[in-house]
UniProtKB/Swiss-Prot annotation:
It is an enzyme of class 2 (transferase). Pfam families: Formyl_trans_C, Formyl_trans_N. One of its GO terms (cellular component) is cytosol. Belongs to the Fmt family. Attaches a formyl group to the free amino group of methionyl-tRNA(fMet). The formyl group appears to play a dual role in the initiator identity of N-formylmethionyl-tRNA by promoting its recognition by IF2 and preventing the misappropriation of this tRNA by the elongation apparatus. Keywords: Protein biosynthesis, Transferase. SUPFAM superfamilies: FMT C-terminal domain-like, Formyltransferase. (6S)-5,6,7,8-tetrahydrofolate binds at residues 112-115. The keyword tRNA-binding does not apply. Its EC number is 2.1.2.9. It catalyses: L-methionyl-tRNA(fMet) + (6R)-10-formyltetrahydrofolate = N-formyl-L-methionyl-tRNA(fMet) + (6S)-5,6,7,8-tetrahydrofolate + H(+). This is Methionyl-tRNA formyltransferase.
Amino acid sequence: MKPLNVIFAGTPDFAARHLQALINSEHNVIAVYSRADKPAGRGKKLQASPVKMLALENEIPVYQPTSLRDEQAQAELASLNADIMVVVAYGLILPKVVLDTPKLGCINVHGSILPRWRGAAPIQRALWSGDTETGVTIMQMDIGLDTGDMLLKTQLPIEDSDTSASLYEKLAEQGPEALVEALTGLAKGELAAEKQDEALANYAEKLSKEEAELDWNKSAAQLWREIRAFNPWPISHFSHQDASIKVREAHVSQSKSQAPAGTIISAGKEGIEIATGDGVLTLLNMQLPGKKPLSVADILNSRSEWFTPGTVLNSTKEAE
């Protein structure tokens, strides 16, 4: 097998982990593309991306065009004469002329089993929708949004304890291995591309802070999924006592209740039970404004009067 000459394009830490795997592999990373340095910290000094820093540590040339629609940037990329371009969380749109420049085109590492979740938030939407598994897809890029042919897929069971943060970490380990395996398969001519089934495709919309507000009229199971999906950002929350209270951990209770949605059923060291549109949700870990996350037991030590059974959350008229 002849090692491939690879251009790598990426920006955040997730991408840097994939670059490290390529550096450690038998393939040759001949250039790295990354977003422009951004002001960071109190001094607003320009901060290089994790991908750029890793490239410089390994003496790999770094390119930071503001756009790849620019003819000069396109000519510069073409002059590198790469076999393939690997794109992981880069942040710039690749026009068709760039996708067609490397001999084997451009491939992408996507954080879901395509075509299940295309778009910006596949990890979060898998949790949000109650999927039992996720994974990584290595995909041949085309001009569509995550619509290209699939080259290699991995699978990862979603555990009840998983949050978006934990799945991100697991996929950040799976992705680099899958990427190197795919490149080696392409170099050997052993990978067969598979078309995506459009009928199975969903768009994973970006998350918003507004979406993370807990709606007690939803089922306990759906609220539990949302709390996990929105951790570490934007964190599920509800308004109570003129405060926005974040919920970092919860589970679906075995308790039953006929109380209106949002009613506190019980409050003790085991958790705060809330009636929902279907079932009961137990809150386990919360965060009051300006405070660090605490177990419900610790919060009740100082704020028990906020969570008296019978109180209705998100209600203008709370129980006496």
